[in-house]
Amino acid sequence: MIIELIRADITSLKIDAIVNPRPTGGDVGTATVSSGGNVLCKFVITAVVPRAGEESEERKLRDAIFAALHRAEELAISSVAFPAFAGAAARVVLRAALDFRAHARSLQRVVFCAFNEEMHREFGRVLQELEAS
């Protein structure tokens, strides 16, 4: 499974599914699937993420990323895109994606979309650090 970082509008990607992280809409750490609607992807995976400062925030965020990636596997799709997360969350979501590699079967490509150059650089730096460790 390849992990990529790009600077783009996530809704413009030709990808099987995009992940919509939300702090509401179910139990934190879970994920649901709906159709792609008016975007180019086939599916939207909504991952329920913790609110900033919530108890056990890092573990819950990791659980939400894993849940979204497991949903992608259940759909037997090959690609999924996440919006890039800012700050300390970047390390958590990238570590979760790297750790998920051992579980990937159909999923071949995970893309993180940064919306600005600063976030793109920060995510790239964190990804390099994690891949080197």
Language-model segments: what does each one mean?
Residues 51-133:
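Phosphate/ribose-phosphate-bearing ligand recognition and processing surfaces
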